[in-house]
Amino acid sequence: MQFIDQANIILKAGKGGNGIVSFRREKFVPAGGPSGGNGGRGGSVILMADNNLQTLLDFKFKREIIAEDGCKGGPNKRSGASGQDTILKVPCGTEIRDIKTGIILGDLTKDKQSLTIAIGGRGGHGNAYYLSNQNRAPESFTEGKDGEIWEVQLELKLLAEVGIIGLPNAGKSTLISVVSSARPKIANYPFTTLIPNLGVVRKMDGNGCLFADIPGLISGAADGVGLGHDFLRHIQRTKILVHLIDAIAENPLHDFEIIEQELKKYGKGLLDKERIIVLNKMELVDDDYLQIITKKLEDLSKKKVLVISSSLKKGLSSLLSEVWKRI
């Protein structure tokens, strides 16, 4: 499935139905009073969160959503039928923003949570509405009101509790594949992962915790280099960041600093999040070098550094234990 996490769409509520002019005409009532009914309300456009959806792909080609118009009024003071509301299902974690003002209209984070965006137009009045002592046979009516039109941006931000971050080829996909049921594409070259991968990791008590493997960030990500903005937004909701560093990289310390700088530049509280620093691929370097680089990383980060091997499944219990302490 193609992963689409942003979409601009136009939402058009239905027009209210027109009122009508009608007079009661029956066999023994040749000159009855006004009986024109009111028009029905136009349908509204409602967004609803759905746990079964993972992407905004449905809106890639469907840019305009139009709700049903209300029906016109009828004789004998019958009101027209209201237009049917249009319910758009979106993934949990979808934020809705007004494109014109930039104002956030809502944030749908729970299954079945809904938000009415474009409200249907009110139905017009039929001539029965205008009956008065001064006017016993009104011929006035009003047309239905237009429905609201909104141009909005949908932005999906994943609801994972733990985000796994790091430069390309740090081993993020391998890690999530061995601690969860996720099965991302894995290969020994950068940028294998082009979309976030989600996996549920079970704790000792049986409860699940959602992990997200965020595609490799690079220098300049906070300024939009590569797909940086697209990926960084997905860690805004996480509680903990697992910063994975490749032990066989040319300069692991520099790699660490690149990601830290991108978090700082992007802002939005990313640098304030709990972070667990992890040195991966311990099996590919000798013990002396591993001790040296671990100590230097701890001095640089002012944090304890965990050492693991995702491929050999070493050190993972210590890593998960550290995660559970901080959730």
UniProtKB/Swiss-Prot annotation:
Mg(2+) binds at S173, T193. Residues 1-159 form the Obg domain. Keywords: ATP-binding, Cytoplasm, GTP-binding, Hydrolase, Magnesium, Metal-binding, Nucleotide-binding. SUPFAM superfamilies: Obg GTP-binding protein N-terminal domain, P-loop containing nucleoside triphosphate hydrolases. HAMAP family: GTPase_Obg. It comes from Prochlorococcus marinus (strain MIT 9301). It is found in: Cytoplasm. The keyword Nucleotide-binding applies. Belongs to the TRAFAC class OBG-HflX-like GTPase superfamily. OBG GTPase family. InterPro entries: G_OBG, GTP-bd, GTP-bd_Obg/CgtA, GTP1_OBG_dom, GTP1_OBG_dom_sf, OBG_GTPase, P-loop_NTPase. ATP binds at residues 166-173, 191-195, 213-216, 280-283, 309-311. The keyword Transit peptide does not apply. One of its GO terms (cellular component) is cytoplasm. An essential GTPase which binds GTP, GDP and possibly (p)ppGpp with moderate affinity, with high nucleotide exchange rates and a fairly low GTP hydrolysis rate. Plays a role in control of the cell cycle, stress response, ribosome biogenesis and in those bacteria that undergo differentiation, in morphogenesis control. One of its GO terms (molecular function) is GTP binding. This is GTPase Obg. Residues 160-327 form the OBG-type G domain. Monomer. Its EC number is 3.6.5.-.
